[in-house]
Each structure stands twice: as structure tokens, then as C-alpha cells.
């Protein structure tokens, strides 16, 4: 998994050198940010179910046809609604992984890489997940540095879906 720190180490190693003072300063900066990131990950994890359910409702309000159309990829029955909440929960989980890892690696490796294919295969609209992520960003209850950290990964996911 790529993070700014692992990339700096890999570059220095491939060049047969130690980390430069600038690279070390970046690493120390990352460690200072780590506390805010871990606070954000902890908060998102503890609120994951309520955030996912709120995001599901936001999607249904903006796209009411998702609860009216029949089919396995829509939320016309409880099974479909459960799948929607599960999928939104995956996004929350991956964002928390990014917060812990300190980089977009988890989003890049586990979600974005195959996202277009998954959405196409299962006839899922990225706009549903954009709406869900916007809800999560607006309602996670974080402030200060933890909010900045969480929002950066949420925005990254939104941009990847857009």
C-alpha cells in the first residue's frame, strides 16, 4: 500500500541513499497529523452505522426511483436497502483505512481501481455514492484537524466517482 512515507522510503532506497532532511521533515509532519487522522478514524468507525443509514436516506430522498424500481440493484425491498447500506458502509470503512494508513492507498487499491467495472456490472450509479459521501461529510460531526483529514479522503472518493 502506498503512502507518502512508503513512497519516500522506496525512492531513497532505490537511489541507495538515506532519507533527506526534507523527507524526514515530511515524515515527522505526517506523524503529527497521525493523531488527528486516528481521531477521525475512531469517530467515523463509532458512527459508521448511523452515518451509513443517514446516507442511505439521503440517497433515497435525492433519487426516489431507487426505492420504486424493481430489480436486484435497487432498494424496492429490504434486501436491496440492506445492500445499499452495506455498500455505503464499505466507503466509510475504506475512508477510515486511508486515515489510518495516511494516504489514498486503500481507496486506490481496494475501491477506485475496479469501481467503474463494478458499477457497470451491477448497474450502479456513481451519483448515488457521491450523494452518500456528501451526506457523510456534512454529518460526521468532526471538527478541526480530524475533520480536515477525514474530508480530504471523502473528497478524494467523491472526485473519483465524479
From Swiss-Prot:
InterPro entries: Globin-like_sf (IPR009050), Phycobilisome_asu/bsu (IPR012128), Phycobilisome_asu/bsu_sf (IPR038719), Phycocyanin_a (IPR006246)
GO biological process, one term: photosynthesis
Keywords assigned by UniProt, alphabetized: Antenna complex, Bile pigment, Chromophore, Electron transport, Membrane, Photosynthesis, Phycobilisome, Thylakoid, Transport
Chain sites annotated for binding (2R,3E)-phycocyanobilin: 84
Pfam assignment, any one: Phycobilisome
Induction description: Phycocyanin-2 is expressed in red but not in green light (inducible phycocyanin).
Modified how: Contains one covalently linked bilin chromophore.
Compartments where located: Cellular thylakoid membrane
Main location: membrane
Membrane-topology annotation of the record: Peripheral membrane protein
GO annotation, cellular component aspect: phycobilisome; plasma membrane-derived thylakoid membrane
Family: Belongs to the phycobiliprotein family.
Subunit structure of this chain's protein: Heterodimer of an alpha and a beta subunit, which further assembles into trimers and the trimers into hexamers.
Purpose of the protein: Light-harvesting photosynthetic bile pigment-protein from the phycobiliprotein complex (phycobilisome, PBS). Phycocyanin is the major phycobiliprotein in the PBS rod.
Protein name as catalogued: C-phycocyanin-2 alpha subunit
Lineage of source species: Bacteria, Bacillati, Cyanobacteriota, Cyanophyceae, Nostocales
Amino acid at each position: 500500500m502506498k503512502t507518502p512515507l512508503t513512497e519516500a522510503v522506496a525512492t531513497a532506497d532505490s537511489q541507495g541513499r538515506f532519507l533527506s532532511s526534507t523527507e524526514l521533515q515530511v515524515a515527522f509532519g505526517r506523524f503529527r497529523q497521525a493523531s488527528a487522522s486516528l481521531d477521525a478514524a475512531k469517530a467515523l468507525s463509532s458512527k459508521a452505522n448511523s452515518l451509513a443509514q443517514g446516507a442511505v436516506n439521503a440517497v433515497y430522498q435525492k433519487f426516489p426511483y431507487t426505492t420504486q424500481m424493481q430489480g436486484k440493484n435497487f432498494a424496492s425491498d429490504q434486501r436491496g436497502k440492506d445492500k445499499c447500506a452495506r455498500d455505503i458502509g464499505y466507503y466509510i470503512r475504506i475512508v477510515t483505512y486511508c486515515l489510518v494508513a495516511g494516504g489514498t492507498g486503500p481507496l486506490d487499491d481496494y475501491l477506485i481501481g475496479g469501481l467503474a467495472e463494478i458499477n457497470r456490472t451491477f448497474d450502479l450509479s456513481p451519483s448515488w455514492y457521491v450523494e452518500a459521501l456528501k451526506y457523510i461529510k456534512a454529518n460526521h460531526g468532526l471538527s478541526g484537524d480530524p475533520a480536515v483529514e477525514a474530508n480530504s479522503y471523502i473528497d478524494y472518493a467523491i472526485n473519483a466517482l465524479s
